[in-house]
Amino acid sequence: MPRQEHIRNFSIIAHIDHGKSTLADRILEVTGLVSDREKRDQYLDRMDLERERGITIKAQTVRIPFTSKTGRKYILNLIDTPGHVDFNYEVSRSLAACDGALLVVDASQGVEAQTLANVYLALDHDHDIIPVLNKIDLPSSDVDRVKAEIEESIGLDCTDAIAVSAKTGMNVDKVLEAIVERLPAPEGNLNAPLKALIFDSWYDSYQGVVVLFRVMDGVLRKGDRVRMFATEKSYEVIRLGVFSPDIVDVAELGAGEVGFLCANIKELGDAKVGDTITHTDRPASEPVPGFKEVQPMVFCGLYPTDAAEYEPLKASLEKLQLNDAAFSYEPETSQALGFGFRCGFLGLLHMEIIQERLEREFQVDLIATAPSVIYKVETVDGKTQDIDNPSKLPDPTRITSLYEPYVRMDIHVPNEFVGNVLKLCEEKRGIQKNMGYIAANRVVITYELPFAEIVFDFFDRLKSGTKGYASMDYEPVDYRESSLVRLDILINGEAVDALAVIVHRDKAYHYGRALALKLKRTIPRQLFEVAIQAAIGQKVIARETISAMRKNVTAKCYGGDITRKRKLLEKQKEGKRRMKRMGNVELPQEAFLAALQVGDE
């Protein structure tokens, strides 16, 4: 077992595309852990989706043996954290497992919103942070400007900041020396009762749940009986090991060390991220602080395009849930779409990733309904319910008040686009809280916005309004009372539950009009007239009509009596009337997507 003063646990904090995974790759190469033959980009991002989108979704760890200039041997544990706002809780748990962090900032771009959010999380844990300026090989890099920006916005002293190029490997050895010299060794009592923090877990079809953890106090040995604090279930440790970067089995792990265990745990819910592991016979008196249950924030309906695909979709969702405890689903039925599932996600990126994984890894064709958030409703009898599906909203006469979730958002943007951002936030019912300069030409704007307003197209419009230069980060604040209504879409008098949305009363008319027009363009023409109506309760606020396709029934009459033609036209009219009464309109997938794109026009 290595001595504690020779261990360093660190993570790398960075905004998307600032070179975090590339720096991790170079560290593995410089220390000789990955040979040239095994070399590949984004070595730690094992999922195809992670490599394609260039983001880290799951936390990974790697144990790196390192010999410093002085000849002392160290063990460096790199804990790779997700960088995206949706996975904030996972980031905070990964950071709790570390004792220090490298802050990687792109020297050509400067500080971005998500960098700041994660830095604040690291500062909450009292971490020492080493600033690293990456991409100095680019002609557009400006090291002095970015140093000033970091000092201004975060208050970190950048006199000892290390300028590197992760791509070429320049100065990466200096980063390793700095980790050893400037980051603290882990604290922890080897003789105290076992206390280990779970910061990630995933499901393996052969070994059950694999748990990644950091030992805070005590020693964990193979064969020990352990208990989880949150679930109070006990298990026997059947395998103990570390990733270096491939699996290496070990007999024991002591305070300050990071590793994984397998203990025949059947469900991911039994090894929750943030939970504490302790011994059954000599338990710790209290868990590692900071554990919380992860709650989904965004919901949407997922339906198979073909009813026969329902069972395969259910099996795919079960498999996904094994590897993603934050993802939840329950069966639901829609009159328009048949049987499907109501799924809950941490945020928009999480939702996109799950949908993409279903279509890519499990080959399931999906229809996804418009995303919605959780509203709180107070009814006349004094009860409060949570509504995650617009079609479940009670009758307006039974509602006393409706509450919607608000988020606080920080937007980092260059000077010249401030007007566009302010206009967009005002349009989305935002309340401006703060605005300040972090550098000569970069502004941070803080707004409080209804979460429902950013679920649709906010991010796309923010990017297009700022030529892609803006970055944003948000966190939930609270629930506030709002004047909200449910907008129903009726096709030939029949309400389509999958197209119902909850909108603010002031926007209902505009939204209903735009959606009806969009549907008119996407629903194919039928042999009979199709009426599309947007309604609030009994009141229709917008209507569009798709005219019927017309067959010329009088073409075969050459000359002859007008009554003959009239008779044929009357017969056609009667047939169309009957068809309209009996006929069903098949809604294409584009019709459901139309609801997502209403704001584009």
Swiss-Prot record:
Pfam families noted in UniProt: EFG_C (PF00679), EFG_III (PF14492), GTP_EFTU (PF00009), GTP_EFTU_D2 (PF03144), LepA_C (PF06421)
Catalytic reactions of this protein: GTP + H2O = GDP + phosphate + H(+)
Gene3D superfamilies named in the record: 3.30.70.240, Elongation factor 4, C-terminal domain, Elongation Factor G (Translational Gtpase), domain 3, P-loop containing nucleotide triphosphate hydrolases, Translation factors
Keyword vocabulary terms for this entry: Cell inner membrane, Cell membrane, GTP-binding, Hydrolase, Membrane, Nucleotide-binding, Protein biosynthesis
Cellular component per GO, a single term: plasma membrane
SUPFAM superfamilies: EF-G C-terminal domain-like, P-loop containing nucleoside triphosphate hydrolases, Translation proteins
GO annotation, biological process: positive regulation of translation
The EC number(s) this enzyme carries: 3.6.5.n1
Sequence positions that bind GTP: D17, H18, G19, K20, S21, T22, N134, K135, I136, D137
Membrane topology label: Peripheral membrane protein
Domain tr-type G span(s) in chain numbering: 5-187
Listed GO MF terms: GTP binding; GTPase activity; ribosome binding; translation elongation factor activity
Subcellular location: Cell inner membrane
Cited PANTHER family: TRANSLATION FACTOR GUF1 HOMOLOG, CHLOROPLASTIC (PTHR43512:SF4), TRANSLATION FACTOR GUF1-RELATED (PTHR43512)
UniProt family annotation: Belongs to the TRAFAC class translation factor GTPase superfamily. Classic translation factor GTPase family. LepA subfamily.
Function: Required for accurate and efficient protein synthesis under certain stress conditions. May act as a fidelity factor of the translation reaction, by catalyzing a one-codon backward translocation of tRNAs on improperly translocated ribosomes. Back-translocation proceeds from a post-translocation (POST) complex to a pre-translocation (PRE) complex, thus giving elongation factor G a second chance to translocate the tRNAs correctly. Binds to ribosomes in a GTP-dependent manner.
Protein name per UniProt: Elongation factor 4
Taxonomic lineage of the native organism: Bacteria, Pseudomonadati, Thermodesulfobacteriota, Desulfovibrionia, Desulfovibrionales
Gene: lepA
